[in-house]
Structures are given as structure tokens and as C-alpha cells.
């Protein structure tokens, strides 16, 4: 019997309510009685004496049977004056709480209510709070990862921006203005390249000319005409190259529309609506221009259908070039349009200049390879009758000439000059380059803003976690108290046998 007295009673928490009902400790219809008790408690707490402990019991916690017992004990002190000679209280407060306790003790309703609270806390409330805290921690890790990604992405885009600016030869402080300034400096850069070619290509051209004349037996045939011309006269005008005479007047094309467009586009009204405003501006200008043309020249369309002077395109320079190409009828000695450009500015002559440079480079590189190999009998006998300029060449001289040519080709084909040539040909290219570079900078700024947003969200998740953790600790504490009260109450019903509520994981 004594051994049986110490055998513990293990009850699975999830089945605690069924266990109490099956063993007739509680009524099957306990929920309706609990609703009646809750209504009476809500009515009773409206009229309570001033007491700090009572205020703590009534603030923010679910009032159950044991709270009611403590409230009744406190009321015995505050309502002592209402006690009659029979030991009963005439105070309505005491009567209300005594009735509540009596209803609780009927069919052990208090025990099943406490068990219901325990099951709800264990199965729902505590897991829900833990899940919310875990979600906050997960969000903090995710926001921290995104913060690092945004920081790295912003730095990468900013680095790409400055790297691209370096390729264009600008600092990036004022992209449009710096590009236009480079275009203004383009003639001086090309003049330097022309001067370098004029000083360094003489011997290389003579070697190539002598080799062609000796091998092909046609000494009168002139090779590399463009290089010869630049070597003699430098980066002169297309007019001088075409006619052989220096022009008396040079009327260079004026790109006046370019600064005006820059000044107009420099007005930034924000990140939205820019395209619509610019399109409306273009349409207004075109319509106005059309109205002016029709008013001044009412018969232009009928008299000259082929010479349409109205340019409906987006590129003002295209109109100017079209007119200048008809400048072959300019007075003698006057260079206009493409004729007024230098050889390295005009696309056709610049391409010819590059082609001849590459032709000369390939020849000299091959000749350097031939001179580096051991001379055979055929080679020696072949060049015995060659001109002195060919016999006096060495591998070192060939390599030096090749390096000079490579330097000239590298300067003309550099990315910076290629962009400047495109800007010179089309002012709209400035807009595209500016937009391309500014887009990288905007992406960097957006990523930086996103990083700040991730920091803010991470802080919000941290604050939410800090607010949930005390709630969880308090709920765990209350649930442990409920567990102890239930175990003690059931133990009394079984002669003090130990009771263990299993599956709480508190």
C-alpha cells in the first residue's frame, strides 16, 4: 500500500481535459458554467476597494479561482466592519465574491478552467510567441544580409561609375559639362597626334616604299598616300588633302545647338515626367518651325520637291551636315562643311589614316621577324641588290618603328577618343552617355537608400523581439504556476500521490 502511495500519476497535458471529465472530476458542460462565472467576475470587479495588491491582481491577467480566493482574503480585511454576530458579511462585495467562489467549486469548475488555460498556453500561446520571436530573429538575419549586399552593390556601382568616367577621361562631378569640354579639346589632341606622326613616320614610310619598289619592281608606285601627306603637312584640312592647295578661308561647322541643348536639359524637375516634358518640348519646336517655314516660303514645296529644307529628325547636326555636304559649290579657296574638318576629324580620312598605319605596322612587324631569324642563302642573295635603306635596317630599328606605330594607333583607337568622335558626330550621344553614367550613380544611391531601409527594418525587428520576450517570460512563469496548482490539486484528490503533467516543455 505504501509503494502504491508513491507511484506518480502521469497525465499527458494535451489530454488533461478529457482525463478530468472521464474520471468524473468535472462536468461535461463546464464551459457554460465558466461563462456565467466570467460574467459575475466582470460585474464584481467594477466595485472594488482601493488596494494595491487587488489592483495588481486585476490588472492585465486572467482572473481564475485562486485569484478569487486571494481577493476574498483581502476583502475580509477591508470589509471587516460589515461582519455581523453570526460571522456573515452584509457587504455586497463579499457576497459577490463568495458566490463566485461557490460557483467555481461546484463540480470542480475551477480545476477544469485552470486545465483549459494550461492547455491553451502550452499548445497555442507559448508556441505562437516563440514563433514570432524566431521570425523576428530570422528577419534580423535576412535584413543584415541584405544590408551587406546593398552596401557591396552600392560600392560596386559607384566604382563602375568612376571607372567608366575614367575611361571617358572625366572626373564625374559634372558629366555633361566635362564631356563637352573634352569635345572642345579634341582638335588640339588630334593636332598632337598629327604632329607626332609627322615627326616619326618618315623613315618607316621610306623603308616600306623602298621594299615595295624593290620586290614589286615598281619604284614609281606611291604607297601610303595619306601617311605621306600627313608626314609632310601634318593634320591639315580635308580641303587641302582633296585639292592639294591650302584654303584661304576655313569655315568650320559650328555646333551651337549642343550648348543650348545642354542648358535646356540641365534643368532637372525631378525623377518623374522628364521624358514627357522633353517630348513635348521637341514637338512644340518642330511645329513652330514648320509654321514659320510655311509662312515665309509658301511655294517652296511645289517649286523644289527634292530640296526639302525641313528636318524632322532629332539631330540638329544632321541638318547642318546635310547642308554642308552641298558645299562643293563654295567659292574657290573656301573650305566648308567636311572640307573644313581636319583629316583626323573627318571619319572617312581618319579611317584611311588608320588603315595605312596598320598596313605599315604589319609590314614592319613581319620584317622584324624576318631579321630575327637566321639569314639563309636565298635571303642574303636576294637583298644584295636591294637599296641601301633596306640593307641598313636591323631588327632593333624595326621594333622601334613598330612601337611608334602602335602608340599612334592606340591613341586614335582609344575608348575616350571613340566616344568623343561620336559626340562630335551627334550631340544626342552626350545625352545617352550622361544618362548611362548617371544611371550607375543613381543605382548606387538607390542601393545606399535600400541599405538604410534594411537597417531601419532590422532595428524594428529587434525592437519587436525585445517587446515579445518579456511577454513570453511572463507567460512561461504564469503557465508554470498553473501547472503546479493543477498538479497539487489533483494530488490532494489521490491521497497525496505525486502528479506529473507531461508534454508541457516549459
UniProtKB/Swiss-Prot annotation:
InterPro entries the record matches: CDK5RAP3
Keywords: Cytoplasm, Cytoskeleton, Endoplasmic reticulum, Host-virus interaction, Isopeptide bond, Membrane, Nucleus, Phosphoprotein, Ubl conjugation, Ubl conjugation pathway
Main location class: endoplasmic reticulum
Tissues expressing the protein: Ubiquitously expressed. Expressed in heart, brain, placenta, lung, liver, skeletal muscle, kidney and pancreas. Isoform 3 is expressed in kidney, liver, skeletal muscle and placenta.
Chain location of the short sequence motif Shuffled ATG8-binding motif 1 per the record: 267-270
Outcome of swapping residue 268 to E: Alters cleavage by CASP3 in vitro. Prevents apoptosis-induced cleavage in vivo
Keyword Nucleotide-binding attached: no
Signal peptide: none
Subcellular localization(s) per the UniProt record: Endoplasmic reticulum membrane; Cytoplasm; Nucleus; Cytoplasm, Cytoskeleton, Microtubule organizing center, Centrosome
Domain remark from Swiss-Prot or TrEMBL: The shuffled ATG8-binding motifs mediate interaction with both ATG8 family protein and UFM1. The RPL10a-binding domain (RBD) anchors the UREL complex onto the ribosome via association with RPL10a/ul1.
Subunit-level organization: Substrate adapter component of the UFM1 ribosome E3 ligase (UREL) complex, composed of UFL1, DDRGK1 and CDK5RAP3. Interaction with UFL1 anchors CDK5RAP3 in the cytoplasm, preventing its translocation to the nucleus which allows expression of the CCND1 cyclin and progression of cells through the G1/S transition. Interacts with ATG8 family proteins MAP1LC3A, MAP1LC3B, GABARAP, GABARAPL1 and GABARAPL2. Interacts with CDK5R1; competes with CDK5RAP1 and CDK5RAP2. Interacts with RELA. Interacts with CHEK1; may negatively regulate CHEK1 and thereby stimulate entry into mitosis.
Family per record: Belongs to the CDK5RAP3 family.
Name this protein carries in UniProt: CDK5 regulatory subunit-associated protein 3
Species of the source: Homo sapiens
